[in-house]
Amino acid sequence: MEFPFSLIIQWLSDFLLPLVRISSMIMVMAGIGAKTVPTRIKMGLAVVTTFLVVPVLPPVTFNNLFSFEMILVVIQQLLIGVAIGFASLLMLNTFVLAGQILAMQTGLGFASIVDPSNGMSVPAVGQFYLILATLLFFVFNGHLMMIQMVVHSFAVLPIDGNWWAVDHYWDIVTWGGWMFTTALVLSLAPLTAMLVINMSFGVMTRAAPQLNIFSIGFPFTLVAGLVIIWATLGNFVTQFEFQWLKMVELMCTLVGCSP
């Protein structure tokens, strides 16, 4: 049985172009996109996911594989997939940054471990928050929601060679500012508590100059930091849920869905 060349090209377009968007999202998304996950597993998951969702996707109208326009279409699919996965990565990095800010202010920053995702030495508090956020990401079915978002994006942003509006690119740029602002807000309550403790040490120094504040203050600050982290863990799920909704809102601005 022979297949026409045009039919083979159509089959390749229907599979390869969605594969580019889905695989780029999986390579970047939180949890699965980490460097600790082997690339073969990521690509295998991308191929299986693409194979399952291709039958329900709109037909690809752009099937000219051997042209310069095809290169632009592939770049477009890469950008869309990376942008969708980048939103989930920013959400997790928000908690990492909040943990690092808290570690620096409480004196716990000296406790560092090597982050296997990037090979750098980072505060243990930030990694602790990252582990909690990653577990909650899968508890909230974040991996399934990411696949749902990228599949929905094919209906709103079909593979036709048309690019995003300029506002969408600016939205992606502003996500970085949102991450730093949110991390500061998450660590604001512990930072306020540490500020009160440091002010009390200042009052003690003025009241009793002979008191060696360095031998007392540093151990007390460490213990207070651990107590503050323990006290704020009860609100961690609530904060994650709020950031989760914000992440969904960010992705919906790209794929045109309702949060």
Per-range role (PLM):
Residues 1-259:
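Hydrophobic alpha-helical segments and their helix-loop boundaries in membrane
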